[in-house]
């Protein structure tokens, strides 16, 4: 079973992602952080997430860019610069089509950059495709 951390402040996008992953082919534990600081607390077991049983190391991070408190770019930078975390696949799942966001994300080591579809069915299909590739097709280091 894989642990997925969804970092998303839009409650509708959280619900759609949860539903798509529940209907998917891979058993997963989905954890949700509603802002960048909460994501960092979860990843580093700080604040309300000091218990690693309640906040296990994610096997995949779905990360929005435009987040309250700490933005997604800064979360990505911290994760990818940490020797113990840098191999965790991080997927930017965002509405931002700005070239500077895309370039900066790849420069910092993002594994994939996906623009969130506006239509419900396409959003669900995108989440299912992420699951199929990153959790079934892709081979990640076991460490």
Task: Enumerate the language-model features and the residues they cover.
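C-terminal output helix
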Residues: 38, 118-131, 135, 139-143
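Acidic, metal-coordinating helix/loop segments flanking the phosphotransfer/catalytic sites
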Residues: 32-60
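Active-site residues of response regulator receiver
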Residues: 64, 94
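Two-component/phosphorelay signaling modules centered on CheY-like receiver
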Residues: 11-38
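Conserved acidic carboxylate
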Residues: 8
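Residue-level signal for the "D+5" position in two-component response regulator receiver
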Residues: 32, 67-70
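The feature encodes the CheY-like receiver
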Residues: 68, 86, 98
């Amino acid at each position: 079973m894989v642990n997925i951390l969804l970092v998303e402040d839009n409650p509708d996008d959280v619900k759609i992602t949860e539903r798509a992953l529940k209907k998917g082919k891979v058993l997963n534990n989905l954890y949700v952080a509603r802002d960048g600081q909460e994501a960092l607390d979860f990843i580093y077991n700080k604040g309300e997430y000091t218990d690693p049983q309640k906040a296990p190391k994610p096997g995949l991070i779905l990360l929005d860019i435009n987040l309250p408190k700490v933005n997604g770019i800064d979360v990505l930078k911290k994760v990818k610069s940490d020797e113990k975390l840098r191999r965790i696949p991080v997927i930017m799942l965002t509405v931002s089509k700005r070239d500077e966001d895309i370039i900066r994300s790849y420069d910092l080591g993002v594994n994939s950059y996906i623009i969130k579809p506006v239509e419900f069915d396409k959003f669900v299909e995108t989440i299912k495709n992420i699951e199929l590739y990153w959790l079934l097709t892709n081979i990640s280091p076991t460490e």
